[in-house]
Amino acid sequence: MAIGDRKKIIIDTDPGIDDAMAIFVALNSPEVDVIGLTTIFGNVYTTLATRNALHLLEVAGRTDIPVAEGTHKTFLNDTKLRIADFVHGKDGLGNQNFPPPKGKPIEKSGPEFLVEQAKLCPGEITVVALGPLTNLALAVQLDPEFSKNVGQIVLLGGAFAVNGNVNPASEANIFGDPEAADIVFTCGADIIAVGINVTHQVIMTADDKDKLASSKGKLAQYLCKILDVYYDYHLTAYEIKGVYLHDPATILAAFLPSLFTYTEGVARVQTSGITRGLTLLYNNLKRFEEANEWSDKPTVKVAVTVDAPAVVKLIMDRLMES
């Protein structure tokens, strides 16, 4: 595939074991050109997310890709953050305690980098957001034209018509900064939301892990070092002998959207009470008599089904070919 035909993507990430997998899949996919990583809190604090992003690029031999460190606080400047290190390990990468990366982040912040790149290539950049949506909300605040300049936002977030994974109401990325999520969902950009209603169908089994281990793929071998913590968490939390491929599935939605089907509607996020972080999609099937919080807001696409076997096979193939 010619360089000019490849989709330019920026990955907004909180690495994270499945983030590592998603980044590696993207780097080993000829359909995309990864032009940068921006970092955010979520699976780890932002400082560690930056370190991990730089480390993963070194592992992949792609230190040419810039890393822009994102915000350390929520959109409302809260520094009390929910960190999912119990899922990914204290270091975010399976408690392997890898040596520090040699590289450094660029001077621009994550939101500044997003705004800059969207301005440089209007309509051409896809941002794949794998963590809380704070950097994107700050980009919207920083530049009112960002929503028009960015080509598409493909995000992992929401639990549409299913229970959440933080509590019965909320999915982790949306719960991490509900105010930011609501800003992004209603900003008017071209958005695809991939929620856990879909990603919980995409499972890498223990047998799949064995296939990775027996392959000659360099990145597959690396992942096998860090996956045990992730498998242990899923066995304890969900009683399954496998792991959900949230982030890698979302990466694929950015450049192979036909692997999913979608519905379209207005998505809003609850920002208070016991359902804080709840995502509610209005499907436009009823015309309400009174105006409400969904009225006259831009629509987004939400993934509703997935060809899970095809997604898992593609992820495995890209990793084993690495």
UniProtKB/Swiss-Prot annotation:
E.C. numbers: 3.2.2.3, 3.2.2.2, 3.2.2.-
Keyword rRNA processing: no
Taxonomy, superkingdom: Eukaryota
GO cellular component: cytosol
Cellular compartments annotated: Cytoplasm, Cytosol
One example of a Gene Ontology biological process annotation: inosine catabolic process
CDD domains: nuc_hydro_CaPnhB
Record note on quaternary structure: Component of the NSH heterocomplex made of URH1/NSH1 and URH2/NSH2 which exhibits strong xanthosine nucleosidase activity. Interacts with URH1.
Family to which this protein belongs: Belongs to the IUNH family.
Function comment: Involved in pyrimidine breakdown, especially in response to dark stress. In the presence of URH1, exhibits efficient inosine and xanthosine hydrolytic activities. Support inosine breakdown especially during the late phase of senescence.
The protein's name: Probable uridine nucleosidase 2
UniProt organism field: Arabidopsis thaliana
The organism's taxonomic lineage, starting at the top: Eukaryota, Viridiplantae, Streptophyta, Embryophyta, Tracheophyta
